[in-house]
C-alpha cells in the first residue's frame, strides 16, 4: 500500500512487479541522459558565439542523429517486449479465481472449490476500526496462498471495470460478456490493496480490492472453515 510522502512505486510483491520496477528505473536513466543532452545542446546554442549562420546541411550529423535514436529505441523496446511476454505467460496455475465487477463491488468465485464464493464490499468510513485504511478496506478479503501460481479470470456483470493491484503489477479490464485472464505469483504473505481502475459510475472510487496472502496451510484451513460455515 502507498504511504504518505511516497514518491516512487509501491514495494514489489511479485516477480512481475520487480521486473516492472527494474524497467521503469532503466528507462528513467535513459530519459535523464537524453534530457541532459538536449539541454546541453540548447544551452550551447544560446550562449555560444561560434554559431555558423550559413550552415545548410551536414550528412554526417544527420546520419548520427538518425542512428542514435534508433539504437536507443531498440534498447528500450527489447526489455519492454520481454515484459509483455512475461505478463501473458501461463505457468500451470494451481488456483483459479473468477473476479466479477459490479456497480459497485466485487464478487469472487474459487473455481477449484465448490460453494466457495462471496461478495466484497467497501467498509464505510463510519464502520472502520482503528488501523484500517479509509476507502480501501472491505468486508470480505480475497484470501490467496503465497508462493503459488494463481490465475484470475476477470469479467463484469454490468459496465466496464478494471481489477488492479499495484504492488503485484496487475491491471486487467473487466468487460461485460468477456473473460480476461491474468496470472501472478505472490512473493510474500501480507495485505495488498487495489481499486477499480476504470471509471464505472458515481461510486467508482468506492469499490476497493484487498488480497490477503497467507501460507498454504493457513489457506487450506481458511477454505475448510469457509465451506463448513
Swiss-Prot record:
Superkingdom per UniProt: Eukaryota
UniProt membrane topology term: Multi-pass membrane protein
Binding positions for Mg(2+) per the UniProt entry: 198
Alphabetical UniProt keywords: Copper, Electron transport, Magnesium, Membrane, Metal-binding, Mitochondrion, Mitochondrion inner membrane, Respiratory chain, Translocase, Transmembrane, Transmembrane helix, Transport
InterPro entries membership: CcO_II (IPR045187), CcO_II-like_C (IPR002429), CcO_II_C (IPR034210), Copper_CuA (IPR001505), Cupredoxin (IPR008972), Cyt_c_oxidase_su2 (IPR014222), Cyt_c_oxidase_su2_TM_dom (IPR011759), Cyt_c_oxidase_su2_TM_sf (IPR036257)
Oligomer status and interactors: Component of the cytochrome c oxidase (complex IV, CIV), a multisubunit enzyme composed of a catalytic core of 3 subunits and several supernumerary subunits. The complex exists as a monomer or a dimer and forms supercomplexes (SCs) in the inner mitochondrial membrane with ubiquinol-cytochrome c oxidoreductase (cytochrome b-c1 complex, complex III, CIII).
PANTHER family: CYTOCHROME C OXIDASE SUBUNIT 2 (PTHR22888:SF9), CYTOCHROME C OXIDASE, SUBUNIT II (PTHR22888)
Name of the protein described by the UniProt record: Cytochrome c oxidase subunit 2
Native source organism of the sequence: Patiria pectinifera
Amino acid at each position: 500500500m502507498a504511504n504518505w510522502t511516497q514518491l516512487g512505486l509501491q514495494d514489489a510483491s511479485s516477480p512481475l512487479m520487480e521486473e516492472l520496477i527494474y524497467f521503469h528505473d532503466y528507462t528513467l536513466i535513459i530519459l535523464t541522459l537524453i534530457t541532459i543532452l538536449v539541454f546541453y545542446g540548447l544551452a550551447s546554442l544560446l550562449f555560444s558565439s561560434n554559431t555558423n549562420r550559413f550552415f545548410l546541411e551536414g550528412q554526417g550529423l544527420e546520419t548520427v542523429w538518425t542512428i542514435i535514436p534508433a539504437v536507443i529505441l531498440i534498447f528500450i523496446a527489447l526489455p519492454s517486449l520481454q515484459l509483455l511476454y512475461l505478463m501473458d505467460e501461463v505457468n500451470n496455475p494451481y488456483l483459479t479465481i473468477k473476479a466479477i465487477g459490479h456497480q459497485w463491488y466485487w464478487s469472487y468465485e474459487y473455481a477449484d472449490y465448490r460453494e466457495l464464493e462471496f461478495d466484497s464490499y467497501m467498509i464505510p468510513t463510519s464502520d472502520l476500526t482503528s488501523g484500517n485504511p479509509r476507502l480501501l478496506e472491505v468486508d470480505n478479503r480475497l484470501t490467496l496462498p503465497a508462493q503459488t501460481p494463481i490465475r484470475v479470470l476477470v469479467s463484469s456483470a454490468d459496465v466496464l471495470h478494471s481489477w488492479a493491484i499495484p504492488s503485484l503489477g496487475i491491471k486487467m479490464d473487466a468487460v461485460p460478456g468477456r473473460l480476461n485472464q491474468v496470472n501472478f505469483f505472490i512473493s510474500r504473505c501480507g495485505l495488498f490493496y487495489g481499486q477499480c481502475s476504470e471509471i464505472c459510475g458515481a461510486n467508482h472510487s468506492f469499490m476497493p480490492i484487498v488480497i490477503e496472502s497467507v501460507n498454504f496451510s493457513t489457506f487450506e484451513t481458511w477454505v475448510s472453515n469457509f465451506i463448513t460455515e
